[in-house]
């Protein structure tokens, strides 16, 4: 059985799709919080990963890129630590067996693995994306501003 790596557009429902695939295939899924918890078992620095975890206004990769812009030289070591910590966690979990990986640059990290299917989930219906954001308790004005 293959693993699945999913990247998604904010509000597209990609996380829900990933969880559904994992349940149907009876394999584990890992998204932000679960990957951070799993990283503990591999001796990865958790505070650093949590600091740049995905949030409502940006992706994991976006947060790393923004951090690079603030003070490029001082932050380079921290950027590498964040990315490589998540990379090692995802690779270690993948080595343990098939799983669904949601976000956290998982498609890029696992792209060289032959036993991984990569997917990008997009939703062209802006109103459906806005509705999904209400499920995670984002206020009405904020919902529309987050969906471009």
Spans of features found by a protein language model:
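Single conserved hydrophobic/aromatic residue that forms the stacking wall/gate
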Residues: 136-148
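Extreme N-terminal starter segment of soluble prokaryotic enzymes
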Residues: 1-3
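ATP-dependent NMP and nucleoside kinases share a basic, alpha-helical "lid"
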Residues: 89-134
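Glycine-rich phosphate-binding P-loop
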Residues: 6-19
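A conserved segment at the C-terminal end of the G1
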Residues: 19-26
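ATP-dependent small-molecule kinase phosphotransfer cores
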Residues: 39-98
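Short beta-strand-centered segment that lines the nucleotide-binding/catalytic pocket of NTP-utilizing
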Residues: 28-39
């Amino acid at each position: 059985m293959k693993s699945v790596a999913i990247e998604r557009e904010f509000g597209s429902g990609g996380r829900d799709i990933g969880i559904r695939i994992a349940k149907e295939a009876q394999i584990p899924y890992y998204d932000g919080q679960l990957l951070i918890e799993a990283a503990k078992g591999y001796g990865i620095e958790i505070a650093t990963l949590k600091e740049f975890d995905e949030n409502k206004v940006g992706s994991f990769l976006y947060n790393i890129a923004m951090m690079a812009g603030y003070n490029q030289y001082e932050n380079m070591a921290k950027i590498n630590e964040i990315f490589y910590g998540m990379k090692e966690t995802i690779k270690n979990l993948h080595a343990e067996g098939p799983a669904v990986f949601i976000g956290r640059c998982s498609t890029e990290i696992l792209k060289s693995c032959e036993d991984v299917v990569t997917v990008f989930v997009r939703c062209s219906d802006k109103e459906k994306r806005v509705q999904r954001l209400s499920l995670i308790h984002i206020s009405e004005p904020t919902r529309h501003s987050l969906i471009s």
